[in-house]
Amino acid sequence: MEEISKNFIENFIDEDLAEGGRFAGMQVHTRFPPEPNGYLHIGHCKALIIDFGTAEKYGGICNLRMDDTNPAKEDTEYVDAIQEDIHWLGFDWGDRFFYGSDYFEKTYEYAVELIKKGLAYVCELSPEQFKEYRGDTTKPAVSPYRDRPIEENLELFERMKNGEFPEGKYTLRAKIDLASGNFNMRDPVLYRIRYIEHHRQGTKWCIFPMYDFAHPIQDALESITHSLCSLEYEDHRPLYDWVINNVSVPSKPRQIEFARLGINYTVLSKRKLRRLVEEGLVSGWDDPRMPTLCGLRRRGYTPASIRNFCERIGVAKVPSTVEFSFLEHCLREDLNDHAQRAMAVLRPVKLTITNYPKGQSEELDIENNPNDPNAGTRKVSFSRELWIEAEDFLETPVPKYKRLYPEGPECRLKGAYLIKCTGCVKDEDGNIVEVLATYDPESRGGDPADGRKVKGATIHWVDANNCADAEVRLYSNLFSDPDPDAADKDYISCLNPESLEVLTGCKLEKMLASAAAPAQFQFLRMGYFCVDSKDSAPGHLVFNRAVALKDSFKK
């Protein structure tokens, strides 16, 4: 991988660590705070790698914190999946695993502190009134409850906590600046009433802190030095700093924002991905067409390819969209170096070598990976009857066709012999059911004894008498539109009806019969494939195409 210069986040950290800097002499301490209301996707992966990778680069530490302050859609299923995904990518949080909800008591105490300082008040504007009184760029916001006495605020807030009021009756708001040009500073809501069971706290709490209040407090309580987050929180940073500076937290983290990752031909909104799952438009969160990490893993993506992708696109302040083909390019690079080669015939037709002795078979040595001299060779059986791709034979060839056709040029069977097509056999409907050819017994290994030039192509094959049957799933982009998330489009209407093709009756090298997930292979001429981790089983092999051989990424 090419050398990557320091990004702007690292430049800020260098300034903070320098003598006289904000965190001089301190250990860099970051955190990754996913909300456990869905599965991590490739967009989260960029943030994850920035958080864990930055700490790793500076010899620091990174916490994993479940941001579970909103109880509406959070579930332990997602908590477990998030941990699995992070470990799969090669990162570890050690003993620094936390839940935002574990700080509810402390967060409540800080809210009381703000009330006592005259910096927070209980407001009873309804959501509709809140919008009405919020003002605009020329007119300040208004709240008739802003000057409520401190003692009354304390009493009402405690009664909110005790469950004495219905949802929406009261909120706790910060008292900052109703005329601020930054609407996030116009007395934002800090707490709201919600009667909903929390996945960890149960029904202990009926008031829940807003993200903008809870997040800086959680960072400070964990002694985070650098709170790295996506760019939409840039306008929230003044509020983050206001909270940190107005409650008695033990540390003062610095928030730094970076641009989110956008990729064409996909959507990364959890809400939109959830709809695909709930409406059965995909098979689940781990559908290999999904941008979730569990989906990418099932499709055959490797941790190295995803980390390489995120590291090479870099860290920016300006949002941009990356080509999905670049992610494929990174996977292709990784698998080209490491995946074992194998032969698989996906749309088979029988090839009979008429001058090969009946009942005879032999074993040929074929290389496992030409890019890895230490990968060695494997034994592949060969006999009179083989399976080849149906497209490797044409009864009437088109111009420049160099594969098998009657009286055409010699072709090379990969690692085996030279053959020459002599004809074909058809069924009563005129379908080709068998290709006929002769072989040169002196060309074992694929090279003629007399050194003559082979004008035909090299094709792959499988021994029809010693092979494994499999189902093969060919995946392509879930969306046919490069920008399905555009504001003027219904992303559901952009779904690609040809994003999955299922092939049955495929013929594979016998050694693949024992392959198990997460084994990955390059099927010669076909692409890179992996064993499906969910549906494949002994006696019912299922392989997923991770990526095609052809690289469409424009370097």
Where are these regions (language model features)?
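Intrinsically disordered or highly flexible coil/loop and linker segments, enriched in small
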Residues: R22, F91, A120, P166, ...
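N-terminal catalytic cores of NTP/NDP-binding nucleotidyl/phosphoryl-transfer enzymes
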Residues: S5-I13, A18-E84, H198-S230
